[in-house]
Amino acid sequence: MSFLANLFGAKNKYNDEQLVSQATKAVVADPLISDPTALVITSKKGVITLSGIVHKAQEKDRIEGVVRNSLKNAGLKHESFINELKLPHK
């Protein structure tokens, strides 16, 4: 990091609001995702976190794939993903 970046703090090079907006649109638009309202998508410094309850194990991977593809197609860069999606306890 440069001296000025260290002095003033590094600027976030990711648009977290735009990342969350694009990811949310993609999840809501996918008809194979059973309950997009049960999901929480956040981004902090380009680290996207997916959390909430999914109804099938396959849905966990699908959601991450849908979000990754959507961000790639929109030309939005991100740092990484944290997939904290869970199946309901029985």
Where are these regions (language model features)?
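N-terminal targeting leaders
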Residues: 1-90
